Amino acid sequence: MNIYAIGDLHLSGNPPTKPMNIFGPHWDNHWQRIKEHWLSTVTDEDIIFLVGDMSWALRLDEALYDLKEIASLPGQKFMIRGNHDYWWSSANKMKNAMGDAITFLQGHGTARIINLTTQVNALTGESQSTEHQCILAFGGTRGYICPDDASFEPDTDQSIYDREILRTEAALQEMEHAIQALQKGHGETENTEETLPVTRILLLHYPPFNENNAPSGFTDLMERYHVDICIFGHLHDQISFKRIPSTFGTTKLELVSADYAEFKIQKIL
């Protein structure tokens, strides 16, 4: 099993009602290019994190074509909301619409025991695949622009920011509860006191800090809950692409906006 991620697909039906090449020729046929790479890279057992801005639709029924397109591709899909996902509805309505084809996460977290595939170099110099068992914990929410960002207006944005901090912590707490339950079950099943290694992944749509990469409530939570990897999108300009560091504290950062990733699924683990 491998772990992949991508964000900001910005789909709008077929033919697209909002072609993305209005933002530049690099967006030409972007969905076809993403699909081709996805199909050549991902297997059904792999996990795919989709970090928001999936469809320009305004209502859930209008987004179904795009969601079914995504669902038809390989992999186990987990999706959070982006700032342009106006179609996002209640958990029950989305579950009824898509069944188990896509799991929608918003302020929630989970964990599972997986066999993670890693590549090692053999003594012969050839690359070989090995698998090791571990706990993968993940969850998240949309996030929001952070204080002291140029676009942050305290009168209107502070309450939304505070709410998203609460949702993020709720997801991280659910992840921890799931980890504890899996560790306990593993110990009882295997009759061992040894614990499985854990990788914690936080999913956000917005970056976890402002345009100056300053600490925020999100980065505080990343440190407090020992988040190993934070995956996010939202950004679409070269200045932002260049300013994102590879790590924040001990957390690895993964920007996966579709255009930043050259319209390819990004391998996380």
Regions found by a protein language model. Name each.
Residues 12-17, 262-263:
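Short N-terminal binding/cap micro-motifs at the start of the first secondary-structure element
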Residues 7, 81, 108, 142, ...:
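Residues at the C-termini of beta-strands that transition into short coil/loop
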Residues 9-12, 37, 41, 88-214, ...:
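Conserved catalytic scaffold of divalent metal-dependent phosphoesterases
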Residues 2-8:
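Short, hydrophobic/glycine-enriched beta-strand segments
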Residues 8, 52-53, 82-83, 205, ...:
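Active-site glycine-centered loops adjacent to acidic/histidine catalytic or metal-binding residues
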Residues 78, 100, 132-133, 208-269:
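Conserved beta-sheet core of the metallophosphoesterase superfamily
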Residues 3, 47, 136-137, 199-201, ...:
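Structural motif
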Residues 2, 16-119, 214-226, 251, ...:
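Core catalytic region of metal-dependent phosphoesterases/phosphodiesterases
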